[in-house]
Structures are given as C-alpha cells and as structure tokens.
C-alpha cells in the first residue's frame, strides 16, 4: 500500500474513532442519554432539564477537556522523545508530570488551608514551575551521563521523590480537602467546567500550533544536532522551544487532571507504527488525534466499567499503555541483537 494512501486511511480511521468515542462519552454514564435527548439539549429545545444539565454542564465539558488534554499529553511525549532521542521519554517517565504534581499539591494545600480558592491559571503556573524544575534537573543529569537508560532511570527516581513529597504534603491538608487532593493526585477528568475548557484551550491550542510549525526543523533535529545546525536550524533556540512546549503541555494536563501515565510514551509509537512514517509533519497531527481518542476511550472505561465507582484515569491508561512500552523495549532489544 502506498504511504500516502495508508496515511489517508489511517487519518480517516482516527478521526472516525475520535468522533465515535466522543459521542459515546456523551451517551454513556450512570444515567443513559438517548440521541434525541442529546439533540434536544444541544438545540436548546429539550423539556428534560435533568438531561440538559447532565449533558451541557457535566459530560460535554468533560469530553472536550479530555480531547484537549489527551492531544496535549501525546504531543508533549513526542516532543520529549525527539529532544532526548529516546523512545521511552515522556512527561511521566522523565519525572516532569511528578514535578508539576508536587508544585500543584503545594499550591493547593497552602491556598486551601488558608481558606482561599485556587484559580485555573494559578494551578497552571504552579504546574509549569514544577515541570520546569524537574526538566532542568533531568537536563543537568543528561550532561553528566552518556547512556540514555541511566537518564531514564534518573527521571523515574525524580518521579518517585516528587510523589513521596506530594504524599507528605497531602498529609498536612485539612480533612475536608484530602479527598479532592487524593482524587486529583490519582488522575481524573471529573469536575471539568467550561471555564476550565476555555483556560486549557487558550494554552493547549497555541502550543499544538507551535509544535506543528516546528515540524520541519524537528525533522532535521532528529538526524542529529550537527546536521540540524548545518541546514540552518538554530539548535539552542530550537531545543529551548521543545523544552518549553513539552513542559507547558504536560503542566496544563497535570494542573487540571493530575498525573496521567503512559499516554505520552505509547501513543506516539502507535501513531508512527500506524502511519508507517516518523516524519514530524505527519506524526504530530496523528499524535493529537490519537492522544485525544485514546484518552476518550480510557475515560469512558474509567467511569463506566464499575459505575458509579470511577477508576483513576492513570490506572486505565497504564493498563493499555504499559504493554505498548514493553513491546517497544522487546522489539528494540531484538533489533539490537541482530
């Protein structure tokens, strides 16, 4: 099959899957909504006030938020894999999500214990600061080690340290706030509002557009820094852009939904395998579509499998994402042994 035809089919399939999963997220739940209920609520002609409230205030903003954050997480993972030239680099593995998680937990505990409310922008700024701190630590380690496996292990250790400190911080939260902090720290898309959607969209969409605009120099960067510099890519500025974009995307996800594992690692590789191409110009849009669809599927499972009990989203993404990482490591080991 020709590459262009294969990509066309793959993109159409991903778009169809995204639309189908988005619709299912609106229909399914502890209270099932019929297509007529959905249409009436969207058109403002419904007489069922409960159905309209469930759709417009709960399920629709949540589904839109899942699409935004799923796309952000997948693209952030791809940017990190490009920057570190490491196939298992990702916001969760490299400790970036955990750094953001620690900063947000500190901010929430300080504000909530003083009876103050934390706005979305405050949490995002805190998450970005934590993500950048973790990223700078990883970069400092990267200058001292040659083997990427050591760097990944250091990233995982950073994640454990940040998670341990976060647990200590949560222990000092007031009893009334512990449940919310615990649910957030486990990863969840529940409780999303249209205000959250607007704030996330204002950050995620420009970052995704910027990443797409960087796809051409990214392709040169993948061939090595020397080659990228020889074709006119400002390597230092480009590297800073990758770090900032990936950290901001990961921070936005963590601020709203908590740390979510394996999406940033697994989805980019599934997209490259599906498209049969590793070119950023082709992979980046696929990562956005694939990440959104993957998170919609996982969120649907998380809230429907044992309803009304809702699973943490990170638990579900790990179940589906971890086997992909294992497959990737086994395949690379087999290729290296040849």
Task: Tell me what each language-model feature is.
Residues 1-338:
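Alpha-helical transmembrane segments in inner-membrane proteins
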